[in-house]
Amino acid sequence: MALVRSIFSAKKILGGSLARTSKAPKGFLAVYVGENQEKKQRYFVPVSYLKQPSFQALLSKCEEEFGFDHPMGGLTICCPEYTFISITSRIQ
């Protein structure tokens, strides 16, 4: 439950223009989530998520369908935001 709160808190923090230019905190990586290029949300996720099978599966699916070469310049996960939140909320 704390993870869900931290993800939602991160989303709140990232809502402002300052968040668009700030670097990811140490131990985190910025990802852009969403199906629509104009409506992608930026999230900071712990680097440890990269070891989690469910997160790896999400990345693999996105790579197969869309590739990772996107104009956003960061790691882009092309899935609905609710899917991303659902998967990351189960990672502990």
Curated annotation (Swiss-Prot):
It is found in: Cell membrane. One of its GO terms (cellular component) is plasma membrane. Disruption phenotype: Reduced rosette weight and area at 22 degrees Celsius but not at 28 degrees Celsius. Disulfide bonds: none annotated. Keywords: Auxin signaling pathway, Cell membrane, Developmental protein, Growth regulation, Membrane. Coiled coil: none annotated. The keyword Nucleotidyltransferase does not apply. InterPro entries: SAUR_fam. Induction: Accumulates in response to sirtinol (a small molecule that activates many auxin-inducible genes and responses) and auxin. Expressed in the dark. PIF4-dependent regulation by temperature. In low thermo-responsive cultivars (e.g. Col-0), higher expression at 28 degrees Celsius than at 22 degrees Celsius in petioles but not in leaf blades. In high thermo-responsive cultivars (e.g. cv. Alst-1 and cv. Ang-0) higher expression at 28 degrees Celsius than at 22 degrees Celsius in both petioles and leaf blades. One of its GO terms (biological process) is auxin-activated signaling pathway. It is a peripheral membrane protein. Pfam families: Auxin_inducible. Higher expression in thermo-responsive cultivars (e.g. cv. Alst-1, cv. Ang-0 and cv. Com-0) than in low thermo-responsive cultivars (e.g. cv. Dja-1, cv. El-0 and cv. Kon). Functions as a positive effector of cell expansion through modulation of auxin transport. Involved in thermo-responsiveness of plant architecture. Enhances plasma membrane H(+)-ATPase. Belongs to the ARG7 family. Exhibits a high natural sequence polymorphism between cultivars, thus conferring thermo-adaptation to environmental conditions. This is Auxin-responsive protein SAUR28.
